[in-house]
């Protein structure tokens, strides 16, 4: 399934794999001038290609290598001769996606992308008249970048934002590194966030501040309860509840307990959150 909308100069593509009428997970891609930011899932590839008819796609920027962000790279590179850019640490897995062993749910929802030739992105780029800073952000994946347009105060966050209140952590994520990256991003003047999961988030600076506040408070509560002698599984039950469908559907890849354990194991957690 694919839906198209616009926001100022942007065309936004919301897509996901259709299982009958059910779409288990949507992602967003953003076209500005001739540049596409992320390419979504290959399961929506034919619809995406049709939606892009009559548009120029000379360049693709991948925020990171995950399969729901690179799924149509190869097809668009073949169709439009688009050059693809990403952080150097993402390039090996974009060019050779089977370097990464996908979980069963990932294969079902997104599938393996085809490999695509990719170039290292610099610190800055222009998309038409729009200047962008390229900002590396740790915590979600190796080689993740965000894109910031200072005149419009736009921030393209890939998977660094994904809503204010998150109660799960992927087993390849780092809670404290995500928090540090978000704190760095919060120093920017932000009007609008463009999020792979949530789409357009107006009042983006406030939303980012709320997310940081939530994460810091959650971390503080986790550490406080643990220092009082509460076992980690009891901390989870009190603050986040027991594991639910997300845990079982993803085979434990998304986990409340892993969030708790990750906070407790981090060297950053040896000091009190201000």
Model-found features: residue ranges?
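Active-site environment of divalent metal-dependent phosphoester hydrolases
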Residues: 44, 65-71, 91-94, 142-144, ...
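Divalent-metal (often Zn2+) His-rich catalytic cores of metallo-beta-lactamase-fold enzymes
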Residues: 79, 85, 177-232
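Core dinuclear metal-dependent hydrolase active-site scaffold
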Residues: 122-149
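Conserved beta-strand hairpin/beta-sheet module of binuclear metal-dependent hydrolase folds
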Residues: 1-52, 146-158
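Active-site HxH/HxHxD metal-binding segment of metal-dependent hydrolases
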Residues: 46-126, 213
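C-terminal regulatory/interaction regions
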Residues: 225-274
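Active-site neighborhood of phospho(di)ester-bond hydrolases with catalytic His/Asp-centered motifs
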Residues: 37-40, 58-66, 84-88, 136-139, ...
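Metal-dependent phosphodiesterase/nuclease catalytic metal-binding core
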Residues: 146-164, 172-191, 198
């Amino acid at each position: 399934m694919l839906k198209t909308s616009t926001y100022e100069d942007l065309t936004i593509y919301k897509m996901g794999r259709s299982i009958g009428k059910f779409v288990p997970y949507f992602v967003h891609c953003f076209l500005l001038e001739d540049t596409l930011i992320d390419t979504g899932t290959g399961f929506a590839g034919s619809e995406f290609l049709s939606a892009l008819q009559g548009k120029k796609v000379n360049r693709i920027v991948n925020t990171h290598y995950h399969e729901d962000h690179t799924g149509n790279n190869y097809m668009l590179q073949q169709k439009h001769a688009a050059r693809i850019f990403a952080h150097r640490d993402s390039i090996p897995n974009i060019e050779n996606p089977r370097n990464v062993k996908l979980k069963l749910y990932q294969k079902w929802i997104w599938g393996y992308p085809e490999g695509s030739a990719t170039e290292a992105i610099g610190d800055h780029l222009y998309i038409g008249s729009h200047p962008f800073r390229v900002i590396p952000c740790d915590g979600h994946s190796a080689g993740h970048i965000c894109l910031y347009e200072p005149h419009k105060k736009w921030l393209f966050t890939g998977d660094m934002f994904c809503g204010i209140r998150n109660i799960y952590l992927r087993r390849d994520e780092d809670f404290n590194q995500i928090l540090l990256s978000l704190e760095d991003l919060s120093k920017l003047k932000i009007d609008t966030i463009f999020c792979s999961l949530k789409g357009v988030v107006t009042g983006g600076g406030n939303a980012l501040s709320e997310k940081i506040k939530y994460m810091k408070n959650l971390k503080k509560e986790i550490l406080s309860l643990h220092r009082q002698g509460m076992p980690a599984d009891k901390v989870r039950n009190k603050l986040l509840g027991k594991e639910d469908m997300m845990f079982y559907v993803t085979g434990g890849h998304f986990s409340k307990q892993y969030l708790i354990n990750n906070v407790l194991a981090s060297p950053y957690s040896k000091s009190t959150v201000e």
